[in-house]
Amino acid sequence: MAIKKYKPTSNGRRGMTVLDFSEITTDQPEKSLLAPLKKRAGRNNQGKITVRHQGGGHKRQYRIIDFKRDKDGIPGRVATIEYDPNRSANIALINYADGEKRYIIAPKNLKVGMEIMSGPDADIKIGNALPLENIPVGTLVHNIELKPGRGGQLVRAAGTSAQVLGKEGKYVIVRLASGEVRMILGKCRATVGEVGNEQHELVNIGKAGRARWLGIRPTVRGSVMNPVDHPHGGGEGKAPIGRKSPMTPWGKPTLGYKTRKKKNKSDKFIIRRRKK
């Protein structure tokens, strides 16, 4: 999809960009694959804020996505490419030969009318899902499982992809979108191709109101708070932090401080850490 720019007719329009949605083929989602989505506004079951800067925004319905891709041996045809308000990637509606309909994350260059397949014997073709051990070295993949049968958890955002680098015993070596190189069980499934909507990262929201439509609330600087609310707070006027390093609102060091557990069980699967 192309990026659409606006003339600076107002301060809010100046610099604002939007996607032209030229790849989207319908604005009517499949009703059987919709579920209600209640707003949590970043609160947990006690009503406490566990994720800051969330709340409000346009009402949404959840699209039920097939992350498992476990419909083996049954061909499916792409019926539509649709917008999904709950993720950065677009989604594709697949009509299978047995009459079932499912949504999948739409890979780059997937078009209406194309046929896709899942299973160990599927061809190496965009949109096909198969175990990593059956995918040739050098292939770009997305929607990767970490545990067989659990469903894809890695590489699902718009424009992302991972690359199969090699095979070692029952494990496959994959370079993820972050630059991390890790081993994943060969039985875990992945989908061939890159995730579509790669222009998403170039969109400039442009104004605060548009962020609120998306359910994003303001981010307040710690230095303008009171000491009771933030370690950077207090003082007269524009006071310095007054600490050795910047802190999170909960008093932990930030900006470069490592928060990963020292003895994480998954360390043995990571060959190279992600790029900083």
From Swiss-Prot:
Disulphide connectivity of cysteines: none
InterPro entries: NA-bd_OB-fold (IPR012340), Rib_uL2_dom2 (IPR014722), Ribosomal_uL2 (IPR002171), Ribosomal_uL2_bac/org-type (IPR005880), Ribosomal_uL2_C (IPR022669), Ribosomal_uL2_CS (IPR022671), Ribosomal_uL2_dom3 (IPR014726), Ribosomal_uL2_RNA-bd_dom (IPR022666)
SUPFAM superfamilies documented for this protein: Nucleic acid-binding proteins (SSF50249), Translation proteins SH3-like domain (SSF50104)
Annotated Basic residues bias: 258-276
PROSITE patterns according to UniProt: RIBOSOMAL_L2
GO cellular component terms, semicolon-separated: large ribosomal subunit
Signal peptide feature range: none
Record-level GO BP terms: cytoplasmic translation
Gene Ontology MF terms in the entry: rRNA binding; structural constituent of ribosome; transferase activity
Key words, A-Z: Ribonucleoprotein, Ribosomal protein, RNA-binding, rRNA-binding
Superkingdom, natural source: Bacteria
Residue span of region Disordered: 224-276
Keyword NADP set for record: no
PANTHER family, alphabetized: LARGE RIBOSOMAL SUBUNIT PROTEIN UL2M, RIBOSOMAL PROTEIN L2
Described purpose of this protein according to its UniProt entry: One of the primary rRNA binding proteins. Required for association of the 30S and 50S subunits to form the 70S ribosome, for tRNA binding and peptide bond formation. It has been suggested to have peptidyltransferase activity; this is somewhat controversial. Makes several contacts with the 16S rRNA in the 70S ribosome.
Subunit structure: Part of the 50S ribosomal subunit. Forms a bridge to the 30S subunit in the 70S ribosome.
Protein family membership: Belongs to the universal ribosomal protein uL2 family.
Name of the molecule in the record: Large ribosomal subunit protein uL2
